[in-house]
């Protein structure tokens, strides 16, 4: 019997040093014992989405993604904005999840790490997830205002305001999963 709820953390960035990934790694370190955060690291391994490839067997990277998402109690997503939208690699990940029978109803919480907003991408992401029948846990993404590219997990953890913002997100997850 699992004691902790499993939350799969999905970063929408492929950058080696990503503020979105840093925020998720900081959340991982700050998580209470009632949450087990898992960091998905296969974004760059996914093949381009092709409906013709959605057959048994699925490409191995896609099967691993779907298994990780299906076994998670919730998703925590931090995604950057690129050209006023969701980056292509992350949209590709979402496209592979559309056909997953276990995705509809999946609880999802969004983090917004952009100091300048990234509202276009956040709105597009919420629209995509709503279309996929995700259960968005908050009307708006939880703001964790980081300075941008090159922000490390250490910098996040050393900033009391950013840690407090991440704690808000973690509390939302705990409360939502307790009620789920």
Show which residues each predicted segment covers.
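N-terminal beta-loop-helix "entrance" segment that forms/cooperates
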Residues: 42-59, 151-152
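N-terminal beta1-alpha1 ligand-phosphate binding loop
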Residues: 2-34
């Amino acid at each position: 019997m699992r004691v902790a709820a499993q939350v799969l953390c999905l970063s929408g960035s492929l950058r080696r040093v990503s503020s979105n990934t840093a925020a998720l790694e900081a959340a991982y370190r700050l998580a209470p014992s009632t949450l087990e955060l898992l960091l998905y690291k296969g974004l760059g391994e996914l093949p381009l989405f092709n409906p013709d490839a959605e057959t048994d067997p699925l490409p191995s990277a896609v099967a691993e993604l779907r298994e990780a998402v299906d076994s998670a109690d919730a998703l925590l997503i931090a995604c950057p904005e690129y050209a006023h939208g969701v980056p292509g690699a992350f949209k590709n990940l979402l496209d592979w999840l559309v056909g997953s029978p276990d995705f509809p109803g999946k609880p999802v919480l969004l983090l917004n790490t952009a100091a300048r907003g990234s509202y276009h991408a956040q709105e597009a992401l919420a629209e995509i997830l709503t279309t996929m029948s995700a259960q968005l846990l908050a009307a708006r993404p939880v703001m964790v205002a980081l300075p941008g590219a090159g922000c490390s997990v250490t910098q996040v953890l050393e900033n009391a305001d950013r840690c407090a913002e991440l704690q808000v997100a973690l509390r939302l997850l705990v409360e939502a999963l307790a009620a789920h």
